[in-house]
Amino acid sequence: GVVGQQAYMPWWLAGQQHKLDFPGGYKALLVSGRKMPSLNTGKSFDRVSGGDGIPFGKKLKEDARRYHGSFQSIGAQGAMAANDDCYCELDPGVKDKWGIPVLRFHWKWSDDELRQVSHQQQAMTEILEAMGARFFHAPYVDKPEKAISQGGKIIHEVGGVIMGDNPEKSVTNQWGQTWDVPNLILGDGATF
């Protein structure tokens, strides 16, 4: 699908998943387009113009004419399987202004996600090379931890609240209504 100056390329290897060394898949996100110059416009010119630092004066004008609007980026957003290192709990020492314990989150990428990112980096590199692209930096095929974002930074995380038909084993019923708080309905993605 296309959204503004973005295009999404759905997971294309679903039928070959058994041959890969990670579960799940990912989608590619292609971003480009022209827009009005801003204060950040010149920050990328030094990477492509071969200069030392951000250009000024005549060189900046030349680079702006040559490179502005000609950048393309490709990213990927992938599936993450639940693992024992990712959970939240009530913090025993920190309370909010009403005296209620706050949530403390624990997060760790598994080897599966890191292998997925290596695959993403290789696939996106091949796509960009086929387009004749020049790279600002070498892809992180062998260093996926440099390419992967912090958990929750890019995608909208869901889950954490169990939906079910037993109040002893779930937080909500099948309609997202909580068992313990009358008339409280969870309308976000927490139950998924």
In which residue ranges do the predicted regions lie?
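Short, functionally important structural connectors and interaction interfaces within domains
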Residues: 82, 150-155, 164, 171
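FAD cofactor-binding and catalytic pocket of flavoenzymes
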Residues: 1-103, 108-111, 154-157, 179, ...
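FAD-site-proximal beta/loop scaffold in flavoenzymes
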Residues: 161-179
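Hydrophobic, well-ordered secondary-structure elements that form the walls
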Residues: 90, 124, 163, 176, ...
